[in-house]
Amino acid sequence: MSNQHSPQPFCLDTKLVKLLEELQEGKQFNNKNIFPEKALYLKLALDYSFFRKNLLEFCVHLDKIKGVIRPNYDTIYILCLLEVDLLNLVFTDNILEICLPRFVSREDLRVFNNTFYTYHDNRLRILQEDFSQLFKKIKTKASVLCFTVEEIFLTNQEILPQNSTVAELQKSTNKVQTNGPQRHDFIVTLEIKLNKTQITFLIGAKGTRIESLREKSGASIKIIPISDKMTAHERNHPESVQQTILISGDLYSIALAVTSIESALITLDL
């Protein structure tokens, strides 16, 4: 007798199944169940056709799924707990694509060195791996690969119910420049101005300090060149020259970048 458990649709909420079946582009499903307060969530990217084909099997695992997002016609994102049977279902085609909550260094991914994988734009795509070994590796690196509840809000605003903390975060977005139309990954750009002396320090020798800031925060940090040629007075007094820095990313990475910059400048009394 087979050990596999077949999905039992008669035990499922048919309205819920229909809602997921008819999920439109740009829409999302939010699970109203209560999840553990300190839970970590994987954000998995799937082909919509695969999700639709295996819909009943996914519905069997709804108690492990916090949200389902359909950003476009071809793609579904699933925010779920780190649960072996659900991940095994997703890994049916021997491909697992994980959307990461923040920048991850190659050092953090060393556990996958014996695995065929690609890492680009905060997406980890794993292919042709033994599932049991893969699951162990993911559990080992859960703190790097998974979202906290707070990070889920930063990248998927409507997955969580509204509360005072969320409202404060939403107010803060009015103070930054949005990066084009509203996006599901909630990327924003913050513009700050520093003087030339501070900028020179932040860049560091051969750009090493600014690269370290980018790597640690996960934010994109761009220094806008000064458009006008500096006068002799300005060259002798660089602290009088203002220069712009653009910091792009989610609120978490931007806050981390700004805090790191402020800390570095305060330490040297700049």
Curated annotation (Swiss-Prot):
Coiled-coil regions, chain positions: none
Gene that this polypeptide is encoded by: MER1
Role, per record: Required for chromosome pairing and genetic recombination. MER1 may function to bring the axial elements of the synaptonemal complex corresponding to homologous chromosomes together by initiating recombination. MER1 might be responsible for regulating the MER2 gene and/or gene product.
GO biological process: positive regulation of mRNA splicing, via spliceosome; reciprocal meiotic recombination
Pfam family, one: KH_1
Species of the source: Saccharomyces cerevisiae (strain ATCC 204508 / S288c)
InterPro entries found in the cross-reference section: KH_dom, KH_dom_type_1, KH_dom_type_1_sf
Conditions for induction: Its expression is meiotically induced and required the IME1 protein.
GO CC annotations on file: nucleus
Keywords: Meiosis, RNA-binding
PROSITE patterns for the chain: KH_TYPE_1
Lineage, broadest ranks: Eukaryota, Fungi, Dikarya, Ascomycota, Saccharomycotina
Protein name in UniProt: Meiotic recombination 1 protein
Ranges where the KH domain occurs: 191-225
SMART domains: KH
One MF annotation (Gene Ontology) recorded for this entry: mRNA binding
